[in-house]
Amino acid sequence: MNKITINLNLNGEARSIVTEPNKRLLDLLREDFGLTSVKEGCSEGECGACTVIFNGDPVTTCCMLAGQADESTIITLEGVAEDGKPSLLQQCFLEAGAVQCGYCTPGMILTAKALLDKNPDPTDEEITVAMSGNLCRCTGYIKIHAAVRYAVERCAN
């Protein structure tokens, strides 16, 4: 099988990799780059566990081919930390109790980050709509919503 070369900005670093054209972006990130925050949940783009920020928008990587990432900018949870410490948004998730098993957390945080990067003062409805593509079986959604609202308030102060 022919290989393809993918050039991308991954977590702030220019990266290049040769891979199979039928490889999913999820598998490229996990297997080839070792970015294990990107989780496989449903494999249908419905649960949000595999969410990354792709050119500024949250996308599910289980339904994307790796080749679609050529010349793109991708942020995973590994790229969100600030100087090796949890970002403000990550801290807010912890402090609001929005983390239990943690499986959905990377996708939740990246979806929230994409929202707040575009709209630093979203309404409650905008938060609910933005987070609707991410499923959680543990905490429910009240604490997750509260964590995003808490981050908005802390950034305003």
Swiss-Prot record:
Alphabetized GO MF terms: 2 iron, 2 sulfur cluster binding; metal ion binding; nicotinate dehydrogenase activity; nucleotide binding
Gene giving rise to this polypeptide: ndhS
Cofactors named for this entry: [2Fe-2S] cluster
Family annotation (CDD domains): fer2
Record's catalysed reaction(s): nicotinate + NADP(+) + H2O = 6-hydroxynicotinate + NADPH + H(+)
Activity regulation note: Reversibly inactivated by selenide and sulfide. Not inhibited by cyanide.
PANTHER family the UniProt entry points to: OXIDOREDUCTASE WITH IRON-SULFUR SUBUNIT, XANTHINE DEHYDROGENASE IRON-SULFUR-BINDING SUBUNIT XDHC-RELATED
BP terms from Gene Ontology: nicotinate catabolic process
UniProt entry tagged with the keyword Glycoprotein: no
pH behavior: Most stable at pH 8.0. Unstable at acidic pH values.
Protein name: Nicotinate dehydrogenase small FeS subunit
Residue numbers binding [2Fe-2S] cluster 1: C42, C47, C50, C62
UniProt organism field: Eubacterium barkeri
Disulfide bonds: none
The protein's assembly and partners: Heterooctamer of NDHM, NDHL, NDHS and NDHF. Dimer of heterotetramers.
